[in-house]
């Protein structure tokens, strides 16, 4: 919690696991600075959208930028849609849609194929 209390920006880049579901909820938001900006490009379920929308509505945090949501595509009924504006940026799961990201994916794929063909372990192997 000390890290959350001190953070000016909280950028989430974690996998969705049992431990990360709802990681940022009422309790976490309550200890953050009123100026903190939360960025979520991980998985929608990591953030409790109702808790985040309430914190934004009440001005308890400075802002948020989300590229992932619990339900995708985001619908008009999502609580974050009601607070979208100057301090809230919502994008349609497109954070990886840059030329740099696409080139990195291609490069890593080719490197992994070569590694497997040569009997080596692929890069970033998930087991």
Predicted regions and their residues:
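Rossmann-like dinucleotide/phosphate-binding beta-alpha-beta segment
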Residues: 1-34
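Rossmann-like dinucleotide-binding domain for NAD(H)/NADP(H)
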Residues: 21, 35, 41-127
């Amino acid at each position: 919690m000390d890290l959350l209390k001190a953070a000016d920006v909280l950028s989430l880049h974690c996998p969705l696991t049992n431990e990360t579901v709802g990681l940022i909820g009422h309790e976490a938001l309550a200890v953050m600075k009123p100026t903190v900006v939360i960025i979520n490009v991980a998985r929608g379920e990591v953030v409790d959208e109702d808790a985040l929308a309430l914190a934004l509505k009440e001005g308890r945090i400075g802002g948020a930028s989300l590229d992932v949501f619990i339900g995708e595509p985001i619908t008009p009924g999502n609580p974050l849609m009601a607070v979208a504006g100057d301090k809230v940026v919502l994008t349609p799961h497109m954070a990886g849609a840059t030329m740099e990201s696409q080139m990195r994916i291609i490069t890593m794929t080719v490197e992994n194929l070569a590694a497997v063909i040569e009997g080596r372990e692929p890069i970033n192997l998930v087991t």
